[in-house]
Structure formats: structure tokens, C-alpha cells
Amino acid sequence: MADLQKIVDDLSALTVLEAAELAKLLEEKWGVSAAAAVAVAAAPGAGGGAPAAEEKTEFTVVLAAAGDKKIEVIKEVRAITGLGLKEAKDLVEGAPKPVKEGVAKDEAEKIKAQLEKAGGKVELK
């Protein structure tokens, strides 16, 4: 049997676009539609009334701008993401770009504080 942990790791590393493409390929291969399952899951309950507002649990930290201290921001991006110097520099210079995706609220706010302290402008989405 295939190494399931490797499959999980590979799927976790996919970008959103790659995950969407994978879903499309699996739908074609297996002859199913993910849209039907989503529609059933999103259907309101028979109890009526307004559904409770759900608090967002996963955030994307987006570097909106590097600001005046670009070198400091690059250093922080490297420390947060583990990217190499060139990759971190490209990310900072290409702002607005996501620095980290799918992180918990407390971690996202911590990353935001680090980047803002270094001089960057940050958004949480």
C-alpha cells in the first residue's frame, strides 16, 4: 500500500490552484462532482432561523508592501517562511503576496506583528 503520510504531505504542499486542478482531475477520473457534496453540506437545517456566524479559523498573512526597511522585511520573511534569500527578496519585492497561508489566528497575528515591526505593511485574509 502507498505511504499515506507521503500522500498527506504532498497534498498539504499544493497551492490553491493545484488543489483545484487536482479536484477537477479526480472528478473526471471517478465520474463524480464535488459541487453536489458541497451543496448538500451547505443546505440550511430544517430548524429555520439565521445560522450562527462562524468565526474564521484559518488566515492568510499577506505582505501588502515592504515599506522603507525592505532589508529588515526580507530578513523577517526568511525567518518566518524558511525561504532562501532570493526567494524571500522576490516575495517582498512582488508585494502584495501571501507570506503564509492557512495559519491559526494567534500565529497569523504574531507573524503580522513581526513583519510590521520590521517595517512592512501586512493584511490578514
From Swiss-Prot:
Record InterPro entries: Ribosomal_bL12, Ribosomal_bL12_C, Ribosomal_bL12_C/ClpS-like, Ribosomal_bL12_oligo, Ribosomal_bL12_oligo_N_sf
GO MF: mRNA binding; structural constituent of ribosome
Keyword Hydrolase on entry: no
Entry keyword set: Ribonucleoprotein, Ribosomal protein
GO terms for cellular component: cytosolic large ribosomal subunit
A GO biological-process term: translation
UniProt entry tagged with the keyword Ribonucleoprotein: yes
Coiled coil: none
HAMAP family reported for this sequence: Ribosomal_bL12
Subunit and partners: Homodimer. Part of the ribosomal stalk of the 50S ribosomal subunit. Forms a multimeric L10(L12)X complex, where L10 forms an elongated spine to which 2 to 4 L12 dimers bind in a sequential fashion. Binds GTP-bound translation factors.
Entry similarity comment: Belongs to the bacterial ribosomal protein bL12 family.
Described function: Forms part of the ribosomal stalk which helps the ribosome interact with GTP-bound translation factors. Is thus essential for accurate translation.
Protein name, UniProt field: Large ribosomal subunit protein bL12
Gene behind the chain: rplL
